[in-house]
């Protein structure tokens, strides 16, 4: 869950996609004090500054919930601060020896020691600052959970671990919507979680609202719904919910495949019904076209070769959407989250659908005005299960990034045929895109946000899944123009 402020904070709830999304945020930071490059993004909306031992920290303003054992090598209070009481790097004085030495007990102490979780290769490369080595790792086949590709460090207050249920890679133990409801209502969890929310709210100057991501098919849906109910009652802020459907489904503990399919269906139905009550707007996300009893029909993206059931790949696609879509309320001169939700939930219809073009299929030497004039077909692919998004009678919020004003149209002296087009009068990318949607979508309204800066992608983003038609600047290579006309 994210806390939004303007600086306006947004408080975030978590799922695996969220960690790729937060990685994007940190990749766009500029740590060079002599740099003259100015960012269009206000990072204070999702991040907070703090101090520890006179050192400045900058961490996501968020709360995450996961099961016991999911953190693997990460301590339950996070890895932002070094534990000063234990000499972790001293091989002659292990953690176990230090703990034994600190206990005033005469008798022999019985020790039950769990096997230490191995540190993933990517995390080892980060800790040793071998960034180039991290780029060469086969992350697609080695990553199984979000700590494996975590780049950002989190405040101890952000981490909430469920003690009653244990994480398993091959099955899900927190199974039903009702189990999630009961978990949130347990005294230890609700008190700790709500105290952490309150702490973030108290340090915020002007909280816009809450941005929530969670798995909709298991017990975390119940946890999330109770969380939203609490936030709605306690704070009366805008709540933007993004229920997520994974690309493949684990069976639940003590349930066979048929029973697990039925449980997922019921969990999803309960989730959608309750989100209509407690969220200002919710948008289901998945790279699968069908996510009801069965989860299948992977979406196709013309320039992306991804493995549909690989969480590392699918989370990168959804995080790309979230990072781009959220720019509307994360820019320095942006509107509020409440404005987005109000515009899209017309007639109090709380559910919306999403689509993405990854990347935008414009040629690297082409102007936007020429691209829009020649393009035919669907520009974007739906990433909401069961939703085929039409073009007529729709309300939409569109964000386009990476096209500088110099690529809008030719200068007047070399414009030639462009001068005959109605769009030549447009003075900005957003204005030209707005005109495009007015002309191509009947009885529709579109709000367009345009950002010149491209999405900065670095390891651990799976850059290898873009095919060779994409240039290093993110545009389609010029010689491929005939292949991409009409593709979205």
Q: What are these language model-derived features?
A:
Residues 2-488:
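Terminal, contiguous helix-loop blocks that mediate binding/assembly
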């Amino acid at each position: 869950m994210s806390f939004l402020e303007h600086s306006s904070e947004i408080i975030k709830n978590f799922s695996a996609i969220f960690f790729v999304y937060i990685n994007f945020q940190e990749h766009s930071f500029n740590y060079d004090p002599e740099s003259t490059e100015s960012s269009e993004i206000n990072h204070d909306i999702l991040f907070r500054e703090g101090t520890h031992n006179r050192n400045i920290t900058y961490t996501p303003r968020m709360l995450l919930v996961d099961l016991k054992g999911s953190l693997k090598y990460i301590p339950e209070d996070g890895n932002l601060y070094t534990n000063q009481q234990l000499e972790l790097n001293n091989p002659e004085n292990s953690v176990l020896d230090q703990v034994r030495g600190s206990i005033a007990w005469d008798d022999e102490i019985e020790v039950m020691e769990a096997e230490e979780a191995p540190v993933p290769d990517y995390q080892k490369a980060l800790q040793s600052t071998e960034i180039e080595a991290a780029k060469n790792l086969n992350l697609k086949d080695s990553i199984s959970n979000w700590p494996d590709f975590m780049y950002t460090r989190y405040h101890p207050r952000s981490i909430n671990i469920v003690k009653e249920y244990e994480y398993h890679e091959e099955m899900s133990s927190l199974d039903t919507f009702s189990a999630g409801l009961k978990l949130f209502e347990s005294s230890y969890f609700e008190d700790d979680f709500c105290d952490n929310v309150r702490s973030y709210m108290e340090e915020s100057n002007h909280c816009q609202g809450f941005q929530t991501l969670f798995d909709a098919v298991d017990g975390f849906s119940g946890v999330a719904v109770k969380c939203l109910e609490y936030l709605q009652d306690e704070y009366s802020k805008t709540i933007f919910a993004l229920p997520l459907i994974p690309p493949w489904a684990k069976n639940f503990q003590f349930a066979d495949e048929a029973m697990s399919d039925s449980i997922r269906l019921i969990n999803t139905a309960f989730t959608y019904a309750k989100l209509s009550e407690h969220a200002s707007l919710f948008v289901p996300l998945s790279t699968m076209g069908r996510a009801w009893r069965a989860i299948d029909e992977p979406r196709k993206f013309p320039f992306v070769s991804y493995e549909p059931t690989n969480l590392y790949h699918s989370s990168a696609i959804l995080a790309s959407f979230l990072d781009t879509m959220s720019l509307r309320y994360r820019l320095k001169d942006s509107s509020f989250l409440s404005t987005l939700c109000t515009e899209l939930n017309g007639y109090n219809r709380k559910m919306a659908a999403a689509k993405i073009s990854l990347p935008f299929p414009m040629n690297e030497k082409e102007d936007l005005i020429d691209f829009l004039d020649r393009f035919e077909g669907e520009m974007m692919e739906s990433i909401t299960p069961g939703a085929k998004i039409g073009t007529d009678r729709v309300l939409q919020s569109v964000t386009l990034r990476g096209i500088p004003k110099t690529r809008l149209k030719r200068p007047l002296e070399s414009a030639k045929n462009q001068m005959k087009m109605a769009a030549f009068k447009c003075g900005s990318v957003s204005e030209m895109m707005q005109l495009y949607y007015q002309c191509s979508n009947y009885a529709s309204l579109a709000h367009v946000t345009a950002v010149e800066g491209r999405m900065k992608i670095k390891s651990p983003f799976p850059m290898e899944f873009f095919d060779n038609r994409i240039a290093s600047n993110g545009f389609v290579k010029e010689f491929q123009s005939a292949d991409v006309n009409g593709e979205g």
